[in-house]
């Protein structure tokens, strides 16, 4: 796969961002460099190597236990948001039209 100008323009539209022509070129160059690096990584033989979740071994959990906490300003935040529905923030959906 190669990142070309057409793909950058499509990503720009999906991301709803504006880029100058020089920024488009820089991003195209950077993404292609990442893909080339991925090709190098793909060639590494990992047969027989055990998968790991983290490179650090944890003998005990360092994560705290989840605890439900009440949040006093929740209603204020929801009421100040431009659009809300059933007590939740409402945001525009992301729909991809393949024809565009």
From Swiss-Prot:
GO terms for molecular function: asparaginyl-tRNA synthase (glutamine-hydrolyzing) activity; ATP binding; glutaminyl-tRNA synthase (glutamine-hydrolyzing) activity. Its EC number is 6.3.5.-. InterPro entries: Asp/Glu-ADT_sf_sub_c (IPR036113), GatC (IPR003837). It catalyses: L-glutamyl-tRNA(Gln) + L-glutamine + ATP + H2O = L-glutaminyl-tRNA(Gln) + L-glutamate + ADP + phosphate + H(+); L-aspartyl-tRNA(Asn) + L-glutamine + ATP + H2O = L-asparaginyl-tRNA(Asn) + L-glutamate + ADP + phosphate + 2 H(+). Pfam families: GatC. It is an enzyme of class 6 (ligase). GO terms for biological process: glutaminyl-tRNAGln biosynthesis via transamidation; regulation of translational fidelity; translation. Keywords: ATP-binding, Ligase, Nucleotide-binding, Protein biosynthesis. NCBIfam families: gatC (TIGR00135). Allows the formation of correctly charged Asn-tRNA(Asn) or Gln-tRNA(Gln) through the transamidation of misacylated Asp-tRNA(Asn) or Glu-tRNA(Gln) in organisms which lack either or both of asparaginyl-tRNA or glutaminyl-tRNA synthetases. The reaction takes place in the presence of glutamine and ATP through an activated phospho-Asp-tRNA(Asn) or phospho-Glu-tRNA(Gln). Belongs to the GatC family. Heterotrimer of A, B and C subunits. This is Aspartyl/glutamyl-tRNA(Asn/Gln) amidotransferase subunit C. It comes from Petrotoga mobilis (strain DSM 10674 / SJ95).
């Amino acid at each position: 796969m190669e990142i070309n100008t057409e793909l950058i323009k499509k990503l720009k539209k999906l991301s709803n961002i504006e880029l100058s022509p020089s920024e488009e070129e820089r991003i195209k160059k950077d993404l292609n460099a990442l893909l080339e690096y991925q090709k190098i990584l793909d060639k590494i033989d990992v047969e027989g190597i055990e998968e790991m979740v983290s490179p650090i071994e944890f003998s005990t959990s360092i994560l705290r236990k989840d605890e439900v906490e009440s949040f006093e300003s929740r209603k204020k935040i929801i009421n100040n948001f431009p659009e809300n529905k059933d007590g939740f923030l409402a945001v525009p959906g992301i729909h991809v039209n393949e024809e565009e």
